């Protein structure tokens, strides 16, 4: 048996079913091309009979993608199979994936037929699909709750009819790994023609077991895993592609299995899917979450500085993320502070570690995360636990034209005691407000990242704006929080401006100290 596991991605079919709004044809093509770069073997890109839009998406992707096999879904009905075949006909190679329910509750309650009738429909659908392609996949919907005798019979007959891939879905995420693995093992033991098809699994995450069930299945002989990027999909989602890929890669010695996934494309593909689908990735998500390679515990940080292998079983670079983070918080030890100071070019004799660390802990308790520019301020300036404010917003008035997209903003800002008023236009209210602030402050800041997130629920939820900005080759992070998005955005910018003002003061103070040291050295 081959040790190669086929990765069947269904982000654009099963994954899209979780979205509040459908993706456009252009957006689907963007994701499909990213999946092709990622190296998926098969991509299921739609359900053509469901709508003209889905048909067009499948056809467009089938015409464009060359290195992955394009697949479309069809019920065990001739009209569905016709639509799938027609939409895929422009592809060099394609797969038709047909399915029917096999569990007792589905057969009796949903289909209202006998199992023998359902079996006949399944066989007929596979034979009909084989008229269009040799690559036919058949799925036993709700296989996880199907009586094992019926499941074995269905699989055997579908293979006889010409199915080259048999998919065993845990449609409602009901089984546990030992149970699901037992189903796969039984199929291999009892279905006489099982060696004539690839056994596939499609596990849902209702009980959080989709990845575990899929790994157990390949240990029992399955050789295709159906999954989605970021695990998106119906209800609690699907088996996560990036988790499967990195499990099989990281634990290759133990599992003896491999995929054709280009892991360095994982981060980029995950970010694209998250952005286009408007589904943020939770921070603690395995592999691609913001915290996946972030270390905040002082003990962990100390270990990481000595050897990355102490607390990382894979590297961020392996998934295309070129860095890892040691967040400086109140839990960070002296070793981390010393390391960060060394990275910024400071030797042990440039500062007093006892004084710096005490000041650092006070600031960390107050603001949570401490940044490099905070450390410099603590090093060269006293009483920096309380952040000084050179810029203060006194008034903000915004007028927007929703039909044209233009806006005008008037701001009143206090600059070290002097109040300045300026107005400006912009492409939207935030842009207008930022332009007005730039006029008033004469402060040149380049915003490199803008992120808006909700804190709370409903109409009274607070909007948090996080911005990254560059100033004189340094990076600064500003935060704003308000019920009004424009106000939160302005708060974040003012925060950054005060940080840059403080950085200038630090630089001046640093220069004076260095000049004094040089003059003393010359005496």
UniProtKB/Swiss-Prot annotation:
Subunit text: Homodimer.
GO cellular component: cytosol
The protein's Enzyme Commission number: 2.3.3.13
MF annotations from Gene Ontology: 2-isopropylmalate synthase activity; acetyl-CoA C-acetyltransferase activity; manganese ion binding
Keyword Cytoplasm: yes
Alphabetical UniProt keywords: Amino-acid biosynthesis, Branched-chain amino acid biosynthesis, Cytoplasm, Leucine biosynthesis, Manganese, Metal-binding, Transferase
Family: Belongs to the alpha-IPM synthase/homocitrate synthase family. LeuA type 1 subfamily.
Species of the source: Shewanella woodyi (strain ATCC 51908 / MS32)
Name listed for the protein in its UniProt record: 2-isopropylmalate synthase
CDD domains linked: DRE_TIM_IPMS
Domain Pyruvate carboxyltransferase: 5-267
Pathway: Amino-acid biosynthesis; L-leucine biosynthesis; L-leucine from 3-methyl-2-oxobutanoate: step 1/4
């Amino acid at each position: 048996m081959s040790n190669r596991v086929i990765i069947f991605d269904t982000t654009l079919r099963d994954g899209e079913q979780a979205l509040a709004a459908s993706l456009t044809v252009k957006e689907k093509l963007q994701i499909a091309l990213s999946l092709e770069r990622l190296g998926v073997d098969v991509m299921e890109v739609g359900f053509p009979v469901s709508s003209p839009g889905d048909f067009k998406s499948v056809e467009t992707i089938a015409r464009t993608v060359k290195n992955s096999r394009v697949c479309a879904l069809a019920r065990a009905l001739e009209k569905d199979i016709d639509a799938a075949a027609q939409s895929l006909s422009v592809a060099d190679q394609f797969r038709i994936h047909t399915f029917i329910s096999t569990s007792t509750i589905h057969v009796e309650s949903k289909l209202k037929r006998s199992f023998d009738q359902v079996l006949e429909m399944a066989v007929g659908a596979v034979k009909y699909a084989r008229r269009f392609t040799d690559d036919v996949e058949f799925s036993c919907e709700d296989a996880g709750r199907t009586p094992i005798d019926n499941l074995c019979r269905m699989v055997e007959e579908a293979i006889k009819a010409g199915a080259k891939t048999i998919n065993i879905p845990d449609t409602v995420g009901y089984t546990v790994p030992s149970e699901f693995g037992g189903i796969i093992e039984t199929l291999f033991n009892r279905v006489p023609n099982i060696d004539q098809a690839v056994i596939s699994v499609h596990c849902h995450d209702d009980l959080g077991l989709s990845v575990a069930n899929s790994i157990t299945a390949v240990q029992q002989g399955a050789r295709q895993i159906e999954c989605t990027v970021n695990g998106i999909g119906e209800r609690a989602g699907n088996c996560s592609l990036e988790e499967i890929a990195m499990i099989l890669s990281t634990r290759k010695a133990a599992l003896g299995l491999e995929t054709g996934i280009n892991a360095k494309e994982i981060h980029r593909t995950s970010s694209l899917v998250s952005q286009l689908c408007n589904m943020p990735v939770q921070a603690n998500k395995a592999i691609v979450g913001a915290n996946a390679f972030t270390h905040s515990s002082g003990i962990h940080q100390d270990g990481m500085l000595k050897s990355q292998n102490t607390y990382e079983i894979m590297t961020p670079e392996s998934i295309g993320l070129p860095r890892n983070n040691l967040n400086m918080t109140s839990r960070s030890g002296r070793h981390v502070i010393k390391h960060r100071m060394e990275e910024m070019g400071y030797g042990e004799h440039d500062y007093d570690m006892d004084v710096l660390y005490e000041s650092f802990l006070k600031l960390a308790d107050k603001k949570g995360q401490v940044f490099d520019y905070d450390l410099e301020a603590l090093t060269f300036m006293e009483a920096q636990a309380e952040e000084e404010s050179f810029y203060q917003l006194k008034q903000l008035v915004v007028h927007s034209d929703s039909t044209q997209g233009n806006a005008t903003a008037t701001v009143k800002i206090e600059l070290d005691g002097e109040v300045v008023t300026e107005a400006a236009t912009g492409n939207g209210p935030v842009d207008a407000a930022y332009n007005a602030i730039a006029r008033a402050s004469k402060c040149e800041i380049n915003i490199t990242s803008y992120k808006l997130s909700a804190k709370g629920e409903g109409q009274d939820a607070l909007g948090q704006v996080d911005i990254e900005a560059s100033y004189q080759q340094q990076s600064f992070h500003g935060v704003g929080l308000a019920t009004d998005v424009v106000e939160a955005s302005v708060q974040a910018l003012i925060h950054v401006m005060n940080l840059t003002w403080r950085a200038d003061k630090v630089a001046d103070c640093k220069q004076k100290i260095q000049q004094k040291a040089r003059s003393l050295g010359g005496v």
